[in-house]
Amino acid sequence: MKFSELWLREWVNPAIDSDALANQITMAGLEVDGVEPVAGSFHGVVVGEVVECAQHPNADKLRVTKVNVGGDRLLDIVCGAPNCRQGLRVAVATIGAVLPGDFKIKAAKLRGEPSEGMLCSFSELGISDDHNGIIELPADAPIGTDIREYLKLDDNTIEISVTPNRADCLGIIGVARDVAVLNQLPLVEPEIVPVGATIDDTLPIAVEAPDACPRYLGRVVKGINVKAPTPLWMKEKLRRCGIRSIDAVVDVTNYVLLELGQPMHAFDKDRIEGGIVVRMAKEGETLVLLDGTEAKLNADTLVIADHNKALAMGGIFGGEHSGVNDETQNVLLECAFFSPLSITGRARRHGLHTDASHRYERGVDPALQHKAMERATRLLIDICGGEAGPVIDITNEATLPKRATITLRRSKLDRLIGHHIADEQVTDILRRLGCEVTEGKDEWQAVAPSWRFDMEIEEDLVEEVARVYGYNNIPDEPVQASLIMGTHREADLSLKRVKTLLNDKGYQEVITYSFVDPKVQQMIHPGVEALLLPSPISVEMSAMRLSLWTGLLATVVYNQNRQQNRVRIFESGLRFVPDTQAPLGIRQDLMLAGVICGNRYEEHWNLAKETVDFYDLKGDLESVLDLTGKLNEVEFRAEANPALHPGQSAAIYLKGERIGFVGVVHPELERKLDLNGRTLVFELEWNKLADRVVPQAREISRFPANRRDIAVVVAENVPAADILSECKKVGVNQVVGVNLFDVYRGKGVAEGYKSLAISLILQDTSRTLEEEEIAATVAKCVEALKERFQASLRD
């Protein structure tokens, strides 16, 4: 919003300069974007009168004039402006004057005729871009007066950013209120004398949409001269606010809009059939707007209509049919309060953003309409003449906004501000803001003024008190708080540490929606009940996920469709499992899951193209589990999962409790999801791993280690992990390493059996092991394997 500094000072005039005023407005929460002078830098320009005006003898487009500037004689000035005429009061740059751009006025001859000055246009004085003719001043402009003084050009245009909550400051009155409060000065409002009705002419008004339009005022003004010129003082105020003068009627409504923040509209009364009806638009109804475009209206659009057709979009834009034109003699002035919700979004739907819709969307003072109507009527009659009828007021009190009583507690005020403000100051601030205040014990009861829609809760009052008291007046004090430092156990494993490990292994973290497609989820978890949303964003996002695989596999498909075939991603997040024993019937588990597919390595000339397999993912997963210190307690067991390949998957158990799955996606599921090639997934219940085993320091043996290899034949269904676990258990004191380095099936091994080659690393921390001890330990392992798994040594 732009406004004139001098216009603001007519309402409240603090004893501070322009820079201090701009800073004060900014600190009040109305950020000043710029302060610009309203005219260029010039001097030596005065008010003059064209006494004589004749055609130049040597030029068709020039005139020779004699101009009275209040001196001893008339000045001879040659002028080329088409509007130059005898009797006109003008702005005269006399000899010695300096105009914007350091243009100096000197005596000269133009086509043989002497010229002792220049008759100036607005553009030549740096006031506006209007260069169509010289400035036409009122007939009563005092001759010889400095034009800067007469037009009050020692003024600034202040532009502010008004936040949506401060709609009351979209008018001079709102900004003036804040400045008056901050400087503890009275607000000097212009005297608005009610215009009594001198005629009985009215139009019937019916409000059929009281929720959208709680108050509607209409007034007939007859016999106006719409061609009457707008006074220069009004044009200048409008210009300094960024509004171009149109005609007297439009200028008056714009003036009231800028002054009071109340949008108004004028209809050509003679084009209204029957009366005014405020209603919602009919489906498919159209309206030709003032700019000539046709708007197709929706049923939720408020319209001002007569008994046959729509005349205007309520609170947004007028219609062409009922607009004021050069032939208009009788008008109906409209002044209304429209509910913000009935206007919000309607203008944008039609590609519009008007000054009226901007204000109505944010909220207009519901108590302002009578004042604005009287102000507009007085200005219109003073400028255009005419006679006014009575004001017709249709108000639905039940739908008008009501201001609730807000309690402000002393404890809350002190706690949020961090500084004690005296009771009498708090009361004074609230009352200066326009609140009705009742003081209590350590509290205040306040009713916000009608123009402050943003004052609704206790925190709003705290903000207002702090703002008016002055943020700069609140002393800087160290924050005093009782801090309870959070404990961090050494046994806590940070999920961030695990993510870093996966990042180092080439994985990228993703975040997918918790809302998933129930059809896809049923493919991954057939027969498992999921939580369905009553009001989903879409059908494809109508179920809560049972695992992270649904979103991760969809991400893989998305990337493969964009030629990204090597994918390594992971995600941590909640799954939502229906559980009657859980709060609200839903168990929320924090999960860690990942997916890999494509080549094992990035493409490189020295590396063969090898596709990832089960052991690639299992190795990465073991690295994660190793961070917990529980890898030795983890078992990978063959266990069916409908989403995984039955021969290339495993359930993950920790101390006998299942904590997740790892494996290749089932070929049938791959086909249904349009996955390209082998895809492997894992998922872990993170909360069962977050408590890690703290590593214990131990002595490093200075004595040599001994390796012994054995090959044992066992049944095909015996897991190799069980064999390794048994070897560790038997040789717990001397066996420091057990590793499976070969699996053989074929000649020499019976069908249904396999040969496992295992290395045993034996070492003692206190001495060198004797060969007999080593042999005894190896024999003990073989015997244990024979007893438990019916294993035999392979020849």
From Swiss-Prot:
Residues 39-148 form the tRNA-binding domain. Tetramer of two alpha and two beta subunits. It is an enzyme of class 6 (ligase). One of its GO terms (biological process) is phenylalanyl-tRNA aminoacylation. Binds 2 magnesium ions per tetramer. Belongs to the phenylalanyl-tRNA synthetase beta subunit family. Type 1 subfamily. It comes from Escherichia coli O6:H1 (strain CFT073 / ATCC 700928 / UPEC). Keywords: Aminoacyl-tRNA synthetase, ATP-binding, Cytoplasm, Ligase, Magnesium, Metal-binding, Nucleotide-binding, Protein biosynthesis, RNA-binding, tRNA-binding. Residues 701-794 form the FDX-ACB domain. This is Phenylalanine--tRNA ligase beta subunit. Residues 401-476 form the B5 domain. GO terms for molecular function: ATP binding; magnesium ion binding; phenylalanine-tRNA ligase activity; tRNA binding. It catalyses: tRNA(Phe) + L-phenylalanine + ATP = L-phenylalanyl-tRNA(Phe) + AMP + diphosphate + H(+). It is found in: Cytoplasm. Mg(2+) binds at residues 454, 460, 463-464. It holds the Pfam family B5. Its EC number is 6.1.1.20. GO terms for cellular component: phenylalanine-tRNA ligase complex. PANTHER family: PHENYLALANINE--TRNA LIGASE BETA SUBUNIT, PHENYLALANYL-TRNA SYNTHETASE BETA CHAIN AND LEUCINE-RICH REPEAT-CONTAINING PROTEIN 47. Its cofactor is Mg(2+).
